[in-house]
Amino acid sequence: MTTAPATTEAPQQEQAPSARPGRDRYFDLLRALALFRVVLYHLTGWAWLPLVFPSMGVMFALAGNLMARSLRRPAVRVIRGRLRRLLPPLWLLGVVGVTGMVLQGWGPDADGHPGWWWLHLTFWIVPFSDPPYAEGLPGVPGIIGENWAADLAGPLWYIRAYLWYVLLSPLLLKALRALPVVTLSAPIVLAVAFEQGWLTLPGERIPSALTDFSTFGACWILGMAHQEGILRRLPRYIVPSVAPVIALVGLWYALRHDFGTGNDLDSMPLAQALWSFGTVLLLLHVSPSWSEWPDRLRRWAGPIALLNSRAVTIYLWHNTCILVAATLWDHLWGFPVLEQNVPGLLESPWPVLVLVWVLIGGCVLAFGWMEDLAAKQKPRLWPRGEPRVRKRR
């Protein structure tokens, strides 16, 4: 009987000093590293990169952590706020991308029936399922390669998955508080069921969504568990003992199924789920919760702040930037002096990576302001720090 008042008063006590807790610089660092690794991986395709740093699991865990913190407020208000921040950058991408597809011949006959095309087009507005795109487009010679729409649409599965995690978060949080072990385990159990063929579903859209949920759902819930203090209540030796075992089981499974270039963790949902869960669990366990940057990282505060302020823009546009950069770089093969004397430079991914980030910077300037508008902040072309937050009435 003595615990009831404590549980009802705790949120009020936590919110009393400040309606908006300060930023955790450790989480900012993880998010920036995750974005950089995503760009590098999509450029190079190096299979070992997701093992070094499981970016998608980290990004979902950080988002789940923020969602759990926000759910101290009414759920409907929180969900509306999250969608308001998420969707406008997607709409801007859609305006540019869908317009380009239509200009190159994409239209209502693409799905076999005009009704399906128009229906699926609404997923560019609210991505309950993957937004459609045109296949086999010719591109723009010398600027952007063929089938560019597939590259532009490649990152959109993350937006769709994020949307569903946000919508399900109030239920997931209630389940986590009531049955933490069962709730954390459920996505991985679902991944096992899919992998072993115990659960099969017709079509492509629903199985795709459930596969993504089973792959990264445990990471989202881990972030919520961290915010709720569930992980901190465990004996200190539990996580360092259990997390590496879970991750190594995922690695073992990947190696047993011909892990390598072209067949990495992205092609193995169960291995991805286990490796990401174990690694993210360790990263959250060692979380130092920096309110200020350590001296050795202070010089990187500006770039990290930029990456965090424009995370959605960078993620949405990076694939297209990679395709444009690769197309432009290929022009250098037309210079015999370069081909004969520095073929290693032309084959190296590092100059292309620099060009990719220059193009990403251009996208930040051209499209990043939409993230500020979506957050009801004053638009900024090039964020150098944290924006001013409007006081809630």
Task: Give names to the regions the model predicted.
Residues 2-393:
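Alpha-helical transmembrane segments and their immediate juxtamembrane cytosolic regions
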